[in-house]
Amino acid sequence: MSTLRELRLRRALKEQSMRYLLSIKKTLPRWKGALIGLFLICVATISGCASESKLPEPPMVSVDSSLMVEPNLTTEMLNVFSQ
């Protein structure tokens, strides 16, 4: 009689442990994904702060002064065509 009771108890404990393992397998990927996401956010934040990156300064553009003078070609053409 005691052997049957022990067998039933072992079987019940085995079923409980299997249910527990299945529930862990379902919840573990969620926790793992959340922890990996937090880790990546921390790494990105730390690397961004450590790089001390500055915005690039806009390049200084110089314009040739001859381009700023009104061209005389248009006025000459108007004079030629108007005559």
UniProtKB/Swiss-Prot annotation:
Q: Name one process (GO BP) from the record.
A: viral release from host cell
**Location relative to the cell:** Host cell outer membrane
Which InterPro entries does its entry note? Answer: O-spanin_T7likevirus
Q: How does it sit in the membrane?
A: Lipid-anchor
Major location category of this protein:
host cell
Which range is the signal sequence, renumbered to this chain? Answer: 1-50
| Swiss-Prot/TrEMBL keywords | Cytolysis, Host cell lysis by virus, Host cell outer membrane, Host membrane, Lipoprotein, Membrane, Signal, Viral release from host cell
Q: Does the keyword Membrane apply?
A: yes
- Any Pfam family hit: O_Spanin_T7
Q: Does the keyword Membrane apply?
A: yes
One GO cellular component this record assigns the protein to is:
host cell plasma membrane
- Function, as annotated: Component of the spanin complex that disrupts the host outer membrane and participates in cell lysis during virus exit. The spanin complex conducts the final step in host lysis by disrupting the outer membrane after holin and endolysin action have permeabilized the inner membrane and degraded the host peptidoglycans. Host outer membrane disruption is possibly due to local fusion between the inner and outer membrane performed by the spanin complex.
Q: How does it assemble?
A: Homodimer. Interacts (via C-terminus) with the spanin inner membrane subunit (via C-terminus). Part of the spanin complex which spans the entire periplasmic space. The spanin complex is composed of spanin inner membrane subunit and spanin outer membrane subunit.
Q: Which family does it belong to?
A: Belongs to the T7likevirus o-spanin family.
List the protein's name: Spanin, outer lipoprotein subunit
Q: Record the organism.
A: Escherichia phage T7 (Bacteriophage T7)
